[in-house]
Amino acid sequence: MILTGKEILKRLGSDIKIEPYDEKLLNPNSYNLRLHEDLLVYSEFPLDMKKPNPVRTLKIPEEGLLLEPGNLYLGRTIEFTETHNLVPMLEGRSSIGRLGMFVHITAGFGDVGFKGFWTLEIQVTHPLRVYSGVQICQIFYHTVEGEISEYKSGKYQANQGIQPSLLYKDFEKK
């Protein structure tokens, strides 16, 4: 089951934390999250799954930043979220999709217990100017059946910013 907006509001401060929170961003069954001003782009190619890949930071200026097709831009939400006893999920807003923007490639799913900023894997189908602070995606929450084991560790838990791929750490464990 997906929580309603009223239930999201009721669980704020207990099962759900959203900081900063603005009631104007609450929807009937989700909450809109906004795009931070920083983006990361990979700076050396080809990328290698077994190694850290260098990135450079782009700042979205007040007049916006033109994103180009064929590039991957890693962004993040302004909001820091923390979720307990629920599964958080992220989806792009339809207004964003109708401009040809994808906000995640495969990482729209969070684990019970995840806390952090959401890293966005942004791609565009044609040149598109983006702006910091735009309501870019929405978070919604599923209830869970069965005994819950919270996500306590991991490569991306309690992150403090945009997270490039840390897949190389999986190879180090072998």
UniProtKB/Swiss-Prot annotation:
Keywords in alphabetical order: Hydrolase, Nucleotide metabolism, Nucleotide-binding
Gene Ontology MF annotations: dCTP deaminase (dUMP-forming) activity; dCTP deaminase activity; nucleotide binding
Enzyme Commission number(s) of this protein: 3.5.4.30
Binding locations of dCTP: 93-98, 111, 119-121, 138, 151
Listed CDD domains: trimeric_dUTPase
Feature type site, description Important for bifunctional activity: 108-109
Top EC category: hydrolase
InterPro entries recorded: dCTP_deaminase, dUTPase-like_sf, dUTPase_trimeric
The name this protein goes by in its record: dCTP deaminase, dUMP-forming
Organism: Leptospira biflexa serovar Patoc (strain Patoc 1 / ATCC 23582 / Paris)
